[in-house]
């Protein structure tokens, strides 16, 4: 038996990176997944690689109608929804005084409003299942330790953290059997991280060496390490855990 036996997840940003790996791990542990992503063809290919207990749907998290359609597709395909992973997000650099306003609005819209939309539409569907459910939102170590060059991203992820706690307390007050928690990744080897390395003025190898040298455990994190924290929060093993934060950053938040 796997830790996700009988559970059904909808994952935003499910085509690749942390979301894609979370989908893979969810299926490996016995669950079923609907991979929602704006990159539909990539999500479909990933779902096909995972077998019969995976499917894909187009999902722009800014679009409430697409969220409604994604939840409906999940219920039609797998009969219910028990788990929501809000993973989709973007990160664009810029300090407060010079950040492009379109970039600011886009980051807040996708990272914060997208997560809100998922919670708003996903919660009633999870309650409808009649089973214990879980919502796991993706924050960032920059929600705890903001970066001066990432004003919009830091602010959006701090807001996601507060949103998660607010929803968790609401569910508890209403006796809803749904737990809500946040996972905060540090630097994780994903397409987003590779874009950071590509922007480094030196070579790729130099960028990796500089990062590893300055990191407490001398390496970048793996998407699976974040996904496994997400699965634990979605499993019955964490039944007394809600309104909490798990940071998966190899100690990066506290480096000297």
Q: Where are the predicted features?
A:
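Short C-terminal tail/terminal secondary-structure segment
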Residues: 3, 145, 230-231, 242-256
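Canonical Rossmann dinucleotide-binding motif of NAD(H)/NADP(H)-dependent dehydrogenases/reductases
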Residues: 3-34
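Substrate-binding pocket helix/loop in short-chain dehydrogenase/reductase
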Residues: 95-96, 100-108, 207, 211
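Active-site helix of classical SDR
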Residues: 119, 156, 164
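Alpha-helical segment proximal to the catalytic Tyr-Lys
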Residues: 124, 169-173, 239
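Residue(s) in the substrate-gating loop at a strand-loop-helix junction
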Residues: 140
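Short, small/polar-rich loop/turn modules that mediate ligand/substrate recognition or access, typified
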Residues: 177-179, 241-243
């Amino acid at each position: 038996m796997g830790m996700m036996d009988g559970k059904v997840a909808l994952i935003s940003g499910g085509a690749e990176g942390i979301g894609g790996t979370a989908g893979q791990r969810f299926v490996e542990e016995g669950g079923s997944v609907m991979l929602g992503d704006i990159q539909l063809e990539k999500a479909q290919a990933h779902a096909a690689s995972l077998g019969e207990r995976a499917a894909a749907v187009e999902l722009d998290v800014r679009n409430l109608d697409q969220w409604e359609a994604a939840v409906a597709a999940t219920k039609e395909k797998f009969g219910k929804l028990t788990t929501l992973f809000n993973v989709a997000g973007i990160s664009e650099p810029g300090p407060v005084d010079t950040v492009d306003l379109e970039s600011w609005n886009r980051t807040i819209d996708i990272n914060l409003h997208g997560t809100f939309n998922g919670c708003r539409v996903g919660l009633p569907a999870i309650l409808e299942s009649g089973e214990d459910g879980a919502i796991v939102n993706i924050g960032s170590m920059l929600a705890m330790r903001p970066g001066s060059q990432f004003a919009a991203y830091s602010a959006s992820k701090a807001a996601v953290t507060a949103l998660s706690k607010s929803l968790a307390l609401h569910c508890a007050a209403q006796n809803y059997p749904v737990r809500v928690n946040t996972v905060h990744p540090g630097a994780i080897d994903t397409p987003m991280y590779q874009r950071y390395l590509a922007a480094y003025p030196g070579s790729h190898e130099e960028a990796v060496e500089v990062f590893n040298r300055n990191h407490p455990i001398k390496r970048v994190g793996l998407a699976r390490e974040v996904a496994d924290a997400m699965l634990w929060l979605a499993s019955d093993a964490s039944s007394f855990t809600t309104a909490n934060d798990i940071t998966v950053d190899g100690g990066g938040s506290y480096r000297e």
